[in-house]
Amino acid sequence: MLFGLQKCFGAGGGSCVVILSPKALERAEKIKRQRKIPFSFDLSEAARYADLHQTFNTPSTTNIWLFNEACKWMLANGAIEGMDRLCRMHAQFLEEWALKSGYLMPLVEDKLFRSYTSYTLKITDPALQANDINRALAATGLFNLQDGIKAHPSAPENSLRIACFPFVDPHGINEYERLTKCVDYVVSQLKNNHR
């Protein structure tokens, strides 16, 4: 299992946690015997260093500290079940907002298959473009909107992706209420300009 620290744990990018079973380590060794594996991608070397309580690359200590702080907070606030509830609460709010908006719908129609950690909304109003919304959000000058709301590279072009991670709003939906009001305002201004 491999997971990045920058998503649900709120740490900076470029760091990850790798959890390997003994069987996975055996496969890594077998592959290493069959072909050349670059040192930085060699899981058997990573495991060897881990057994020595060392790293074979100098990690970002800030990310390790942030990861540890996030884990402590998560454990104190419901652990996995609590974080699951929080992410689902964020996603539920976004779904309800999108369905009331008149210009958004969840990209994945079947609720069973929707991600509740990274929620993608398709823009249903043909007069609206995600790029225009993003530029307008960036122009607000609000720090957390300086990049707008980017779609995932593999998602359809005219869509918005909003993170539902625990640390976006660790206390509920207040940050999502602010964000959606801002998006609604920007969209209303864009629609007025198109008239």
Where would I find each of the regions flagged by the language model?
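Predominant activation on well-ordered alpha-helical scaffold segments within soluble catalytic domains
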Residues: 62-72, 92-95, 131-134, 138, ...
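Structural signal for terminal/edge beta-strands and the immediately following C-terminal loop/tail
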Residues: 166, 170-195
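Polar/charged alpha-helical tracts
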Residues: 26-30, 76, 100, 127, ...
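Active-site C-terminal subdomain of aminotransferase-like
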Residues: 6-96
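Short, low-complexity, polar/charged sequence segments that are solvent-exposed and flexible
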Residues: 20-23, 36-39, 138-142, 182-185
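Flexible, glycine/charged-enriched surface loops at secondary-structure junctions
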Residues: 77-86, 103-110, 147-152, 190-195
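Conserved C-terminal alpha-helix-loop-beta "cap" of PLP-dependent enzymes
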Residues: 99, 103-174
